Amino acid sequence: MTEINGNLSAEGLNFCIVVGRFNDLITNKLLEGAIDCIVRHGGSEDNITVVRVPGSFEIPLIAKKVAKTGKYDAVICLGAVIRGSTPHFEYVAAEVTKGIALVSLETEIPVSYGILTTDTIEQAVERAGTKMGNKGFDAALSAIEMANLIKEIR
């Protein structure tokens, strides 16, 4: 039996982080977490490109554009969609989720999902580096592992 696993070394890997500016109190913390993860796992800030977009809804398009350049081993998507009193939350959350999944499938580049979808700002804060860890860090960790796994399979 053969088992293939991706390792957690970011050394020599190139990343693009696509981050929404909307709810930047949260998304900036997610970005800090993602960069921290890459550096802690042997990556270099010189191998990280950050692209800021207006909000989470715009993330899939730019993720696809950067993935198609062939410059990056993985794309990390970071954003925060916080429920309001309208159905807008459901529409945005669903479309962003579908869009990010499609980008990965269409480009065959790992695209990690670091989009917070929470009911309150407090829940978002908890997931951006306080009680519940930092989901930006988690998304970067997934991107590192998947980039290495793809290299192993190729």
From Swiss-Prot:
Pfam hit, one: DMRL_synthase
CDD domains: Lumazine_synthase-I
Active site: H88 (proton donor)
Chain residues that bind 5-amino-6-(D-ribitylamino)uracil: F22, S56, F57, E58, A80, V81, I82, Y113
Superkingdom, taxonomy of origin: Bacteria
Group of enzyme by EC: transferase
Record GO terms (molecular function): 6,7-dimethyl-8-ribityllumazine synthase activity
Residue runs in coiled coils: none
Keywords: Riboflavin biosynthesis, Transferase
SUPFAM superfamilies cross-referenced by the UniProt entry: Lumazine synthase
Record keyword Transferase present: yes
Pathway: Cofactor biosynthesis; riboflavin biosynthesis; riboflavin from 2-hydroxy-3-oxobutyl phosphate and 5-amino-6-(D-ribitylamino)uracil: step 1/2
InterPro entries per the UniProt record, alphabetical: LS, LS/RS, LS/RS_sf
Entry GO terms, CC: cytosol; riboflavin synthase complex
Self-association state and partner proteins as the record states: Forms an icosahedral capsid composed of 60 subunits, arranged as a dodecamer of pentamers.
Purpose: Catalyzes the formation of 6,7-dimethyl-8-ribityllumazine by condensation of 5-amino-6-(D-ribitylamino)uracil with 3,4-dihydroxy-2-butanone 4-phosphate. This is the penultimate step in the biosynthesis of riboflavin.
Similarity remark: Belongs to the DMRL synthase family.
Protein's name according to its UniProt entry: 6,7-dimethyl-8-ribityllumazine synthase
Gene designation: ribH
